[in-house]
């Protein structure tokens, strides 16, 4: 699996574990929260910190990376208990770090984790955010096992772009 495939597998494992615990918060890749999604939810991202040099396209590569998991929640009213709002966050951290659940087993090895500073976004609704950074290690490949779809000629792509631009004008 490539690093991006590992990242998606980690998100999937987290979402399945959260659903099994009865938690209604879901993890979305960074920048892809669907319209209509409600609080609470997670956004994740990853950053490669080290990739083993001199690997071939056939062999696996030892890769260190950070899995960043940000949690967003908002109180439905001023009377809401902040501690209760962060229960999905605490459950997710426990699911990921606990040797009993081991939700990322077979995908990546968790080396350590750290919390990011908490902050509040104020606007029409006060949004609370907490984050976790997981230092992970895994073996990745350079070749994706996901089928790329069908081939499309460059001329067809250019025609599609021109049509889209023409319709907007």
Where are these regions (language model features)?
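Charged, amphipathic alpha-helical segments and their flanking helix caps
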Residues: 1-33, 49-169
């Amino acid at each position: 699996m490539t690093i991006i495939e590992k990242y998606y597998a980690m998100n999937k494992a987290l979402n399945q574990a959260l659903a099994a615990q009865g938690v209604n918060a879901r993890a979305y890749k960074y920048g892809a929260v669907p319209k209509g999604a409600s609080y609470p939810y997670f956004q994740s991202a990853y950053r490669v910190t080290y990739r083993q040099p001199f690997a071939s396209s056939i062999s696996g590569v030892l890769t260190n990376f950070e899995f960043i998991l940000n949690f967003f929640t908002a109180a439905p009213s001023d009377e809401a208990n902040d501690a209760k709002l962060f229960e999905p966050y605490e459950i997710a951290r426990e699911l990921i770090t606990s040797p009993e659940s081991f939700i990322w087993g077979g995908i990546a090895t968790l080396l350590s984790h750290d919390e990011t500073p908490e902050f509040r976004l104020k606007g029409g609704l006060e949004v609370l955010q907490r984050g976790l950074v997981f230092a992970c290690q895994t073996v990745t490949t350079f070749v994706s096992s996901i089928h790329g779809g069908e081939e499309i000629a460059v001329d067809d792509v250019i025609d599609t772009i021109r049509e889209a631009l023409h319709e907007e004008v």
